[in-house]
């Protein structure tokens, strides 16, 4: 019975370490996706057309 418990404990420990590495990698990928420059470019793409349309409407062109 003791060798079985020891094996299960070892598997649990290794699985926990593996899960921790996967979580760190996932967090690193999310940080890369949330790059501030990319967010600024996305914001410009959304805001500039709206501002352009608003100016066109105000100026009557």
Swiss-Prot record:
GO cellular component annotations of the record: extracellular region
Residues that bear Leucine amide: 59
Proregion residues excised on maturation: 23-44
Signal sequence extent: 1-22
UniProt record similarity statement: Belongs to the frog skin active peptide (FSAP) family. Temporin subfamily.
Biological function: Antimicrobial peptide.
Protein name, per record: Temporin-CDYa
UniProt organism field: Rana dybowskii (Dybovsky's frog)
